[in-house]
């Protein structure tokens, strides 16, 4: 969610965890009456309304949100524990005590999501791409928040010279979204694919 500096407005995307299947477009606003009246007037002029199918799918997804988030969190925790033992990988995930965000995360949040970053030490980018491409249970993409596990190599999201994270020499970023599959299957899949890293 995005909160304004005055903390009177909250904007939430409903395209991700809310529906749980990466198949809707939507968002929600929690605003004061003054802002609400402006938004309502703009909505009438532009015709931007949530479609009935999207509204139905989001409502249906909300019924299982807590159960799904528990599973995402537990699966991600197990995978984070497995990956943190690998010397080639620096885990970007607030659950780990050595994470630079751990204290803030602990103060403000009761759990983590299924999204994590891996800073991978490798001599060449090709082996990192091979690692991602050889994952059998992970789809490729960045529609985080759905039921399925996804993997994305950093460079496929760079635009021009802009980089989303500062990486050291021989470091490559892979982002993982951990889905609802059996965590032991996901760990086995990651383990077999890690053999491609050089």
Which residues are covered by each model-predicted region?
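Small/polar loops that bind or transfer phosphate-bearing groups
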Residues: 2, 31, 178
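Hydrophobic aliphatic residue packing
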Residues: 10-11, 24, 178
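Short, solvent-exposed coil/turn segments
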Residues: 4, 24, 111, 169-171
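Single conserved hydrophobic/aromatic residue that forms the stacking wall/gate
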Residues: 1-7, 11
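PLP-dependent enzyme catalytic core of the Aspartate aminotransferase-like
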Residues: 122-126, 149-198
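Structural preference for beta-strand elements that scaffold enzyme active sites
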Residues: 9, 90, 115, 173-175
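Active-site C-terminal subdomain of aminotransferase-like
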Residues: 14-115, 119-156
């Amino acid at each position: 969610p995005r909160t304004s500096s005055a903390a009177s407005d909250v904007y939430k995307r409903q395209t991700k965890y809310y529906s749980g299947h990466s198949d809707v477009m939507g968002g929600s606003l929690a605003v004061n009456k003054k802002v609400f009246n402006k938004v309502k007037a703009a909505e009438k002029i532009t015709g931007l309304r949530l479609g009935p199918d999207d509204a139905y799918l989001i409502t249906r997804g909300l019924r299982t949100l807590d159960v799904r988030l528990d599973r995402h969190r537990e699966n991600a925790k197990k995978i984070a524990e497995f990956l943190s033992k690998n010397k080639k990988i620096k885990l970007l995930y607030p659950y780990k005590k050595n994470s630079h965000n751990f204290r803030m995360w602990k103060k403000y949040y009761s759990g983590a999501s299924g999204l994590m970053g891996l800073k991978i030490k490798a001599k060449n980018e090709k082996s990192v791409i091979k690692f991602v491409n050889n994952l059998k249970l992970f789809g490729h993409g960045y529609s985080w928040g759905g039921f399925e596990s996804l993997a994305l190599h950093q460079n496929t999201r760079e635009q021009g010279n802009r980089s989303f994270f500062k990486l050291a020499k021989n470091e490559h970023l892979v982002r993982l979204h951990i889905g609802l599959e059996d965590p032991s299957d996901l760990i086995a899949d990651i383990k077999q694919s890690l053999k491609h890293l050089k």
